């Protein structure tokens, strides 16, 4: 996974920082990792590209579903604010790790992704 320092565009960094702040407020200490993936992570975006971000949390699947209204609100508010569609996907961290070696989708996120936030584990 790549580091956030690979991004030089200040406007885009401001968007990512805003996403990080809003998602952190929603999930609190349950937030484990935020990862930018897709065309923006590969630096292949065009004017029609959305911003894809995976939210990985320390929560069980049932409780994670309860965060959906908050996620939709963040996506709507920030997409309107920045005039760019921001797509937020959420998964439990344990599910992501369990299927990382199996699912190409998760492998692409890991290999091409840029970590926006990562909780340090002691």
Task: Describe the function of each predicted region.
Residues 52-56:
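Short beta-strand->loop micro-motif that forms the acidic, two-metal-ion catalytic signature
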Residues 1-30, 41-47, 58-122:
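Catalytic core of pol beta-like nucleotidyltransferases
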